């Protein structure tokens, strides 16, 4: 069990705000952390890793990582950290990057096998693709068998095909080792696929906490589905009006009435929902 109760004043793009997080994470849980940019997600991960100071307490099992009397340095926290930028040693091979963390050839071989990197063990990082580098980074983070694995948008720089592959490998590693994991992500499909729980941060505080289905699937009453998107344009096609809306990485077209169109402004956030298979915009 990990118990987090921390406070820290932040100076973000929207002005000063207080990061105030009080949450418990069960052992073996894979938790997704989401929310707008500047809401405190990365700062929370850095505090957990001991890379930034904060007030409050962090208790992992029976050990305090942070309280009034102590703040354990990063190397004593048994943390695995996966960044967006890989952070590999360029002068070491794939295998050497792993063994540098811990001289455990058996564990290294197992991690490379799970992530399908065995044939690349002697390769240097400069010869690898972005997806391969991130898989090496993930394996290296697991070499010390961390009590807590932190991943800060680890798949954000990858294309959709490689993202899907790494999602499956993250799940395979999690199923194999059962490591408690906190992953920052903005992708609903990624969160739904990987996480057992999702927390939404807004201006430094938790505004939603639950299963991915409960938090991300915005349904209401008899609605079949509801998605938030950005209105890009309203165009006239023959005798009907069509709204062009960006939802995630896709564009959708929704027929709107004249009265609906009068109340819509290009650039605004809208909800696209359906009742009895008839999409509506709100």
Predicted regions: what they are:
Residues 63-67, 105-122, 126, 171-172:
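Conserved ABC ATPase "signature" region
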Residues 65-81:
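ABC ATPase NBD coupling module
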Residues 149-153:
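Catalytic Walker B motif of ABC-type/P-loop ATPase nucleotide-binding domains
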Residues 124-128, 132-134:
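Conserved ABC ATPase signature
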Residues 143-147:
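A short, proline-enriched helix->beta-strand linker immediately N-terminal to the Walker B motif
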Residues 209-210:
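ABC ATPase "signature
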